[in-house]
From Swiss-Prot:
Extracellular side: 48-74, 129-161
Cited function: Regulates membrane-cell wall junctions and localized cell wall deposition. Required for establishment of the Casparian strip membrane domain (CSD) and the subsequent formation of Casparian strips, a cell wall modification of the root endodermis that determines an apoplastic barrier between the intraorganismal apoplasm and the extraorganismal apoplasm and prevents lateral diffusion.
GO cellular component terms listed in the entry, alphabetical order: plasma membrane
NCBIfam families in UniProt: A_tha_TIGR01569
Annotated source species: Lotus japonicus (Lotus corniculatus var. japonicus)
Protein name: Casparian strip membrane protein 1
Pfam families: CASP_dom (PF04535)
Amino acid sequence: MKSSPAELISEAKSSTQNSKMKRAVSVLDFILRLIAVVATLASAIAMGTTDESLPFFTQFIRFRAEYDDLPTLRLFVVASAFASGYLILSLPLSILHITRSSARRTRVILIILDMVMLTSLTAASSAAAAIVYLAHKGNAKANWFAFCQQYDSFCERISGSLIGSFIAIPLFIMLILFSALVLSKR
């Protein structure tokens, strides 16, 4: 059965609107990836360069606090750097989606890899947040003392470095949702 001219025009308009929506979402995807790169890279650098030394009795004996004294903070640096590297490598695919809005396979690959990065960054950030909480508050039952009264600069830096990762986590969620939205619109 032949379609009427009105139906053909309606389908063409729908296809054009769908293409414009995909392109707009792809541009937003690129911008969100750039913001997430900055957030995760800043978190990794801030945590990875955190250390503080305090004198003990004399100036020759010093106590030193570094991020790599705690394996959880090391995991945080690795996960943030890995997520940042992934986001940088995914930018060309995001540009491809702006130019070719019909690319489906690469969107599926990005959704899967975005989910992997989301879960690893969430796990590392949550574990680091627990350690930062213990550093600030301690745990009297386990006889762990809060050391942030002595190492205040160290604690401020490790607390601040969590901000970037907790900004990147919702960005990853939005990236996944936007890619799924584009895939659902045919």
